[in-house]
Amino acid sequence: MATRGPTPDKARMGLPDRWLHCPKTGTLINNLFFPFKTPLCKMYDNQIAERRYQFHPAEVFSHPHLHGKKIGLWIDLTNTDRYYFREEVTEHECIYHKMKMAGRGVSPTQEDTDNFIKLVQEFHKKYPDRVVGVHCTHGFNRTGFLIAAYLFQVEEYGLDAAIGEFAENRQKGIYKQDYIDDLFARYDPTEDDKILAPEKPDWEREMSIGMSTQIDNGRPSTSQQIPATNGNNNQNGNQLSGGGDNSKLFMDGLIRGVKVCEDEGKKSMLQAKIKNLCKYNKQGFPGLQPVSLSRGNINLLEQESYMVSWKADGMRYIIYINDGDVYAFDRDNEVFEIENLDFVTKNGAPLMETLVDTEVIIDKVEINGAMCDQPRMLIYDIMRFNSVNVMKEPFYKRFEIIKTEIIDMRTAAFKTGRLKHENQIMSVRRKDFYDLEATAKLFGPKFVQHVGHEIDGLIFQPKKTKYETGRCDKVLKWKPPSHNSVDFLLKVEKKCKEGMLPEWIGYLFVQNLSDPFGTMKATATLKKYHNKIIECTLLVDNQGRPKEWKFMRERTDKSLPNGLRTAENVVETMVNPVTETYLIEYVNHALRVLKRAAAAHRHHQIHQQQLHEGEPEARRQKL
């Protein structure tokens, strides 16, 4: 029986091909993964002339790119055991897991990927503060494929964003086009604008001089030919979605004078700019993403002070304002250029380096006795103001900045004639938030009639939280049970069963499943939405049991469906709904809890003050 692990004879087979100058490690990915090439035990040291190229397992655990975090799970994807002893891993109180994969241009199978994801999920649930170390021979293609698949399926990244995230943290990332093509074929087969692999790295071109050419299983390679590159020198390792798609319209074309940015260089620059302004280290749309309010998280309302606002049935855009130029970024990170919209400072100069979060709506207003459409931008949060980062300020301060530094300055400029209403492409207002006590009033007819557009829910915003990019579990969105919905990718197929008439079925897909999340009957109306993103609600019976999915509308502002976790959370709100009555009753309960907590806090402060004031008197009496 062959000896497991390295032996002198196995070490004499030589270093892995092209290993010597391959970068040792990447950096932390999503605060969870740490990619690296396979380390080698000390039996290989005599084959490495310069000590700086030696790479032992112990070096991984102490690497500065871990920023003090500990690796708790080590996943070895190589197809051999000759490189190091597993005890060199387990002696660091780390779980070692071997997942043999062929490599050499062969992507991980669906089963391999599912096993990897399950393993990481179970570990991360048990040890949320530990890191997962992953390596194949070089730590690029197999490693990148599996990490990107995990980010896509579990963390709900877009596929291009998942691949890009790995590229940013592992020296341009996956460099073999076959692996990228396989990712798209498996997870996003409808995407035409696929990412191109970066140019093959210099170290990959090198052949090991004086060493036998090896592959993972320790046998000599049958070919020493270096594959040709695709000629693409994509420095970022990914392409942002939306490039070249000129059919997309701002607000579905309801507002004239706004055009999509067709200059790809300018678009990429602007996308990188707002990503930097937000300190956002991922790909795609950098805005804060609220979560659905459910019976499972409604207790957050009693844990800290919240403000409440209505949820407008408009479209969300991040707006970048700089020196007279105004750009809008939708949830697909598409860039639009807005003309004839001015933002000024107190002295009338153009506002600089400002980034705000908005909803754009079409209000119904009465002008000279006739009802007219009034485009309006509602600013509800701010990340940058005049080059100053305000993301770490509490929400109530950011809310005040919107009024005093943006809305009031525009109002003053209109009064002095510096700005003219007739020259503005749309109206701009601050979207109001109210103390939590006002929740019930937002359901009242007086408020609903006052708002000139459709309301489709409420937003609950903590007063003292900073602005967070990406998913924020503290910011809650509530919709009436009848309005709760999931965004699906629709696939319409014709099914023919023997002895029966053909039937058209709509299959509803979310990002994280190769199997449909649900189905619905494909009517003639529905067929035209094949391969498009549609919004659906779930009809339930009077006992809360699911009946069927119902089509609501096409989501022209989105190019990807919801992720699995989001879809499951929304379904929970449909099956166990938070009704208007339940919400108002719970808000009143939360207010009572907060009031008691505030009273207890004041009582504690008074008590501490009395103790402090009594100390000098007690000392005098003792003397």
UniProtKB/Swiss-Prot annotation:
Inhibition and activation profile: RNA triphosphatase activity is inhibited by magnesium.
Region called GTase, residue ranges: 241-585
Residues annotated as catalytic: C136, K311
Keyword match Nucleotide-binding: yes
Presence of the UniProt keyword GTP-binding in the record: yes
Catalytic function, reaction form: a 5'-end triphospho-ribonucleoside in mRNA + H2O = a 5'-end diphospho-ribonucleoside in mRNA + phosphate + H(+); a 5'-end diphospho-ribonucleoside in mRNA + GTP + H(+) = a 5'-end (5'-triphosphoguanosine)-ribonucleoside in mRNA + diphosphate
Skewed-composition ranges (Polar residues): 213-229
Residue ranges, annotated region (Disordered): 213-243, 603-623
GO terms of molecular function: ATP binding; GTP binding; mRNA 5'-triphosphate monophosphatase activity; mRNA guanylyltransferase activity; phosphoprotein phosphatase activity; polynucleotide 5'-phosphatase activity
UniProt xrefs under InterPro entries: Dual-sp_phosphatase_cat-dom, mRNA_cap_enz_bifunc, mRNA_cap_enzyme_adenylation, mRNA_cap_enzyme_C, mRNA_Capping_Enz/RNA_Phosphat, NA-bd_OB-fold, Prot-tyrosine_phosphatase-like, Tyr_Pase_AS
One record GO biological process: 7-methylguanosine mRNA capping
Bias (Low complexity): 230-239
Binding site for GTP: R316, R331, D357, T358, E359, K477, W478, K479, R553, E554, R555, T556, D557, K558
Superkingdom as given in the UniProt entry: Eukaryota
Keywords: GTP-binding, Hydrolase, mRNA capping, mRNA processing, Multifunctional enzyme, Nucleotide-binding, Nucleotidyltransferase, Nucleus, Protein phosphatase, Transferase
Basic and acidic residues composition-biased segments: 610-623
Protein family according to the UniProt entry: In the N-terminal section; belongs to the non-receptor class of the protein-tyrosine phosphatase family. In the C-terminal section; belongs to the eukaryotic GTase family.
Function: Bifunctional mRNA-capping enzyme exhibiting RNA 5'-triphosphate monophosphatase activity in the N-terminal part and mRNA guanylyltransferase activity in the C-terminal part. Catalyzes the first two steps of cap formation: by removing the gamma-phosphate from the 5'-triphosphate end of nascent mRNA to yield a diphosphate end, and by transferring the GMP moiety of GTP to the 5'-diphosphate terminus via a covalent enzyme-GMP reaction intermediate.
Protein name, UniProt field: mRNA-capping enzyme
Organism: Caenorhabditis elegans
Organism classification: Eukaryota, Metazoa, Ecdysozoa, Nematoda, Chromadorea
Gene: cel-1
